Swiss-Prot record:
Expressed by the venom gland. It comes from Dendroaspis angusticeps. The keyword Secreted applies. Belongs to the three-finger toxin family. Short-chain subfamily. Aminergic toxin sub-subfamily. InterPro entries: Snake_3FTx, Snake_toxin-like_sf, Snake_toxin_con_site, Toxin_cobra-type. Gene3D superfamilies: CD59 (2.10.60.10). This is Synergistic-type venom protein C9S3, chain 1. It is found in: Secreted. This protein shows a synergetic toxic effect in that it enhances the toxicity of other toxins.
C-alpha cells in the first residue's frame, strides 16, 4: 500500500506502508479560523478524531 504523506505546489510525497499497516489516513486538526494542521500516512488502525478535527481513512493507494 502506498499512502500520500504530503501535498504541495511541487506535487505529492508518498510512503510505502510497513507490514501490518494497511490503512492510509488523513487527519485535520483545527488550529484557528481557516487554519488546519494536516497529517497523513500509514497506520494499522484508523485514528480517532478529537473534538477539533476529523479523520478520513481508506485502503486504496495514493489517497
Amino acid at each position: 500500500l502506498t499512502c500520500v504523506t504530503g501535498k504541495s505546489i511541487g506535487g505529492i510525497s508518498t510512503e510505502e506502508c510497513a507490514a501490518g499497516q494497511k490503512i492510509c489516513f488523513k487527519k485535520w486538526t483545527k488550529m484557528g479560523p481557516k487554519l488546519y494542521d494536516v497529517s497523513r500516512g500509514c497506520t494499522a488502525t484508523c485514528p480517532k478524531a478529537d473534538e477539533y478535527g476529523c479523520v478520513k481513512c481508506c485502503k486504496t493507494d495514493r489517497n
